[in-house]
């Protein structure tokens, strides 16, 4: 006797979120030499291209630049005067902002028997931020799909955040994979 075919985790409601996006969000401050230097120290990469204007001027960049992940970090700072999310989010908040960096709800309506977790990020750096840049981001759900893992069925979603400077040039693209695991 054949077992009945399980319903797909990719329902019409789940499929409908593909292409949905946030409003653009712009950094509250211009990128500064001090912020770049502090970030490079925090990630323990003190290359002179991140803080020495004379050395950096002689490189292919023509001046000081920020390490690749700086852009992703910089836009995520909350504006002055806003509430700390640790005080406003639910107790089980994992620090991941399902609203996307640009704000506005970007959640996937998985079936109720699903529990979600962070499946990883891929950061594609196309250009490095420079002092004076104003960074803007916009997030969009680009893909949802299903696969079977050792523990059962999984639903996966990909949120793509594009970071640009004030000239509209793409600095980097972050691809976040969210995983929804079926609970039995």
What role is predicted for each listed range?
Residues 2-120:
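Hot-dog-fold acyl-thioester-processing enzymes
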């Amino acid at each position: 006797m054949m077992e009945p075919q399980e319903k797909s985790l990719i329902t019409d409601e789940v499929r409908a979120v593909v292409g949905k996006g946030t409003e653009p969000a712009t950094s509250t401050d211009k990128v500064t030499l001090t912020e770049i230097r502090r970030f490079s120290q925090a990630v323990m990469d003190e290359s002179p291209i991140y803080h020495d204007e004379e050395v950096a001027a002689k490189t292919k960049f023509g001046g000081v630049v920020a390490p690749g992940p700086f852009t992703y970090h910089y836009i995520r700072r909350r504006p002055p005067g806003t509430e700390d999310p640790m005080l406003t989010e639910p107790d089980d908040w994992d620090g991941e902002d399902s609203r996307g960096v640009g704000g506005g709800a970007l959640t996937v309506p998985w079936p109720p028997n699903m529990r979600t977790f962070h499946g990883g990020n891929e950061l594609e750096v196309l250009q490095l931020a420079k002092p004076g840049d104003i960074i803007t981001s916009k997030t969009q759900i680009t893909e949802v799909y299903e696969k079977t893992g050792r523990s059962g069925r999984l639903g996966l979603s990909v949120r793509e955040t594009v970071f640009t400077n004030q000239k509209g040039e793409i600095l980097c693209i972050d691809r976040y994979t969210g995983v929804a695991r079926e609970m039995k």
